[in-house]
Amino acid sequence: MGIPDDPAGSAPENFDLATMRVEYVEKDGCGDLDVDWLGDDPATGWLTLLQTWINDAWKAGLPDANAMVVGTVDADGRPVTRSVLCKSVDPDGITFYTNYDSAKGEHLAVNAYASATFPWYQLGRQVHVRGAVTKVSAEETAEYWSKRPRGSQLGAWASQQSRPIASRAALLEQLAEVTERFADLDEVPVPPNWGGYRIAPEVVEFWQGRENRVHNRIRVTGGRVERLQP
């Protein structure tokens, strides 16, 4: 599984994307998403609802319940997306950490605006966020860095993220080198080119799948909340 029988051959047997379809039904048992789920103040209610949905996904046993697809735009205006882990959700926004010299870091240096989508397919839910992006403080980065497993810290040092490399063996050799370099240190320092980005939400949209594609969509823009047609 995962490796084609013939990489240069035809598509798998009975491969028909047009007929791949799952009918959405109520999966969460909590009724239809509506504007009142955001409370009296949508400007802050989005945060509580997003935190609740992430926690629901975690309790349901979904893998990487805090994973989100982050979209950036390169210098030529071409969009790029990738999955990353959200590591903080607070009134200021949603935060993720990465190598500042990575492709997304280069994009954000040119266009400091991004989108993020949390997809929880098994629950029939999705949240989309977009807004301006800023780097978090060195102190906040250091606090999160201290919570990462040592192996993950070493991996951050070993990888020149988004840069080509000859083979996996070469990558593991780089990891071995940094492992030896920091072997005598109790704490691995934060790489100078590594840290967090925070997306300050300008728009937050909650999506809930329903039968016949008549889905529920609630959009929050500042203090304004509105239902959108699916």
Curated annotation (Swiss-Prot):
**TM helices/strands, residue ranges:** none
Query: Catalytic activity, per the record?
Result: pyridoxamine 5'-phosphate + O2 + H2O = pyridoxal 5'-phosphate + H2O2 + NH4(+); pyridoxine 5'-phosphate + O2 = pyridoxal 5'-phosphate + H2O2
Name the chain's protein. Answer: Pyridoxine/pyridoxamine 5'-phosphate oxidase
InterPro entries recorded for this chain?
Pyridox_Oxase (IPR000659), Pyridox_Oxase_CS (IPR019740), Pyridox_Oxase_N (IPR011576), Pyridoxamine_oxidase_dimer_C (IPR019576), Split_barrel_FMN-bd (IPR012349)
List the NCBIfam families hit by this protein, alphabetically: pdxH, PRK05679.1
Q: Does the keyword Transmembrane helix apply?
A: no
Keywords linked to the UniProt accession: Flavoprotein, FMN, Oxidoreductase, Pyridoxine biosynthesis
Q: Summarize the protein's role.
A: Catalyzes the oxidation of either pyridoxine 5'-phosphate (PNP) or pyridoxamine 5'-phosphate (PMP) into pyridoxal 5'-phosphate (PLP).
Residues the record lists as binding substrate: 21-24, 87, 144, 148, 152, 213-215
Residues that bind FMN? 82-87, 97-98, 104, 126, 161-162, 207, 217
